[in-house]
Amino acid sequence: MHEHSVEKTQILQKYLELPQNGKVIAEYVWVDGTGNLRSKARTLNKVITSIEQLPEWNFDGSSTNQAPGYDSDIYLKPVAFYPDPFRRGDNITVLAECFNSDGTPNKFNHRHEANKLFQAHKDEEIWFGIEQEYTLFDMYDNVYAWPKGGYPAPQGPYYCGVGAGKVYARDVIEAHYRACLYAGINISGINAEVMPSQWEFQVGPCEGISMGDQLWMARYFLHRVAEEFGVKISFHPKPLKGDWNGAGCHTNVSTKDMRVPGGMKYIEQAIEKLSKRHNEHIKLYGADNEQRLTGRHETASMTSFSSGVANRGASIRIPRPVAKEGFGYFEDRRPASNIDPYLVTGIMCETVCGAIENANMSKEYERETNEQ
């Protein structure tokens, strides 16, 4: 790690301790037109206690691949806010949806459509837990701590590894964990993954739209923490060719009927419904996913649907304790690490709980790829 790439946090600290004279800083965060995050800050005159107190804002969408230059204003509508783990105090981080100048959702705003489904199926109490895998790179786009011009020893000792040479950058991971807890993200765990310098964190259980909200914010906090250490975060599903594991976003799902004794019947019904919409789901399950879903490295084939108990090579896995108890949840192992969680949770709700008249998650993919 090169010193010039690391933020001077110790110098910054004395300024962070200065009083703000009654002002609050709100960092607005949004999803841009490339599947990445952007943010900018503004000063507010009072402590924020409800989402309604936050003003709408705007930005230049032509600089984020979200609008043409001749009509570039994109509007930010706050939908959730969290304590800011970097500025602390009364300062907040705000998640915002993007809308065009005519009031329609921007084509990269998939939260709006997904939320219609969650509102319509509120009584189902659909819960999600997402396992976010990612890979660390240095400032020169080499996998973090890998030998220069070479490769580490083959996979084997790295998954949940302990000790030098088996795990790398634990300080980044621990800092991110604490930042999420401080901000109120329902982060439920972390672990080192199968490939060296690949890690995972889990968020959930979260109900409905809050799953996407919290995962996007957890990603934002990860990027911000990694900035300070001079580390890049990659969510590419297959960052390295060869005999190395890819990166996924395994998505665990349950409805209230699945979580009570006798729930296995509803789990099996959901899997049957999912089997009939495999291709529609795959379209929304992340770019470059075909590089990962090969049937090797603990993945299913991209071209066929399968399910099984404790089978990490299946599209849908039923955990063994769930099969034994007869109720609980199932795991969709198909989503890639770079998913938009609103697309994945939205189409999952649509398939499992039922379509509604004014929402169509499959069209979200077409809207993003075809709309000018």
UniProtKB/Swiss-Prot annotation:
Residues 110-372 form the GS catalytic domain. It is an enzyme of class 6 (ligase). It catalyses: L-glutamate + NH4(+) + ATP = L-glutamine + ADP + phosphate + H(+). Signal peptide: none annotated. Transmembrane segments: none annotated. It is found in: Cytoplasm. Its EC number is 6.3.1.2. Keywords: ATP-binding, Cytoplasm, Ligase, Nucleotide-binding. Residues 24-103 form the GS beta-grasp domain. Pfam families: Gln-synt_C, Gln-synt_N. GO terms for molecular function: ATP binding; glutamine synthetase activity. PROSITE patterns: GLNA_1 (PS00180), GLNA_ATP (PS00181), GS_BETA_GRASP (PS51986), GS_CATALYTIC (PS51987). One of its GO terms (cellular component) is cytoplasm. One of its GO terms (biological process) is glutamine biosynthetic process. Homooctamer. Belongs to the glutamine synthetase family. This is Glutamine synthetase. It comes from Candida glabrata (strain ATCC 2001 / BCRC 20586 / JCM 3761 / NBRC 0622 / NRRL Y-65 / CBS 138) (Yeast). The gene is GLN1.
